[in-house]
């Protein structure tokens, strides 16, 4: 079995995007003087925190379904959807930090990619002999 390099790169990109959201929370803590363990503060801090939390919640679903789709269906299509998912998460984060009502397009992109990956994983699993 060959090493699935492209899915590994997608996974790394997703984890880097998550780490970026964590760093944004740290920056917002410093800028707005929100000391740990506080989880509330000015709206810009809370928006950054919500981006990080939601991204973590989405990663829990994305990573397993992405790898199942890549291994059991199509590595190429799964990787393409994975890269688009990462872009959607970045757009979600940027939009949310600009204004909470601007988070929709990024969320929609990443959500649709997750659903497509889920369908690929299910079809791939049931097509195995």
Language-model features: locations:
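Membrane-embedded alpha-helical bundles that constitute the cytochrome b-like, heme-associated redox core
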Residues: 20, 26-27, 72-75, 93
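Core segments of transmembrane alpha-helices
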Residues: 53-66, 114
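Structural signature of hydrophobic alpha-helical transmembrane segments
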Residues: 75-84
């Amino acid at each position: 079995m060959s090493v699935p390099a492209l899915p590994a790169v997608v996974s790394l990109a997703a984890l880097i995007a998550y780490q970026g959201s964590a760093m944004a929370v740290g920056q917002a803590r410093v800028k707005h003087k929100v000391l740990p363990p506080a989880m509330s503060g000015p709206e810009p801090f809370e928006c950054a925190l919500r981006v990080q939390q939601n991204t973590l919640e989405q990663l829990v679903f994305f990573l397993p379904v992405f790898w199942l789709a890549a291994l059991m269906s199509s590595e190429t299509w799964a990787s393409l959807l994975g890269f688009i998912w990462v872009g959607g998460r970045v757009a979600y984060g940027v939009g949310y930090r600009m204004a909470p009502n601007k988070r929709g397009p990024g969320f929609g992109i990443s959500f649709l990619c997750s659903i497509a990956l889920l369908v690929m994983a299910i079809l791939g699993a049931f097509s195995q002999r």
